[in-house]
A protein has these predicted regions:
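Conserved acetyl-CoA-binding loop-helix of GNAT-fold acetyltransferases
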Residues: 62, 68-81, 104
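Residue-level detection of beta-strand scaffold positions
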Residues: 1, 62, 79-83, 88-89
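Alpha-helical elements of Rossmann-like donor-binding domains used by nucleotide-donor carbohydrate transfer enzymes
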Residues: 14-15, 35, 74, 78, ...
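Conserved acetyl-CoA binding element of GNAT-fold acetyltransferases
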Residues: 52-64, 112-115
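Conserved active-site alpha-helix within GNAT-family acetyltransferase domains
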Residues: 73, 85, 89-91, 95-118
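Conserved residues at the C-terminal ends of beta-strands
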Residues: 43, 63, 94
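Acetyl-CoA-dependent GNAT
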Residues: 1-51, 58, 117
Length: 118
């Protein structure tokens, strides 16, 4: 969603461990010389509107100083490949500031996202 956040180490560790156990989740990490420069977190699920399985990018982030180098595109293309192996008919993503990035990769704007903090 192109927002800044601060990772709480304990929460990250438990969430990451749980994600690694899930069949419907995928995490990619982009590294350069041992440094993490980006990541993608995605899932898939069944949906009526897609008449089957949909994969969605929950989070995609690339370090500001590494943007424009194809890192995000490479991770997104790899995610699309995973989605195909899962028989997904669509890949979806919500974004606020990266619309031009997704449009350049043939994604189309289809909805407005709402949220409610619980």
């Amino acid at each position: 969603m192109a927002t800044s956040f601060f990772v709480q180490t304990d929460q990250f560790r438990s969430t990451f461990a749980e994600l690694m156990e899930r069949d419907d989740a995928l995490v990619f990490v982009a590294e350069e010389q041992g440094d993490v420069v980006g990541y993608l977190l995605g899932f898939d699920h069944l949906s009526f509107y897609a008449n089957g399985r949909v994969s969605y990018v929950e989070e995609l982030a690339v370090s500001a100083d590494r943007r424009g180098q194809g890192i995000g595109q490479h991770m997104l293309e790899a995610f699309e490949g995973w989605a195909k192996t899962r028989s997904s008919t669509l890949v979806t993503v919500a974004t606020r500031r990266a619309a031009p990035f997704y449009a350049a990769l043939d994604y189309e704007e289809t909805a407005i996202l709402f949220r409610k903090v619980l």
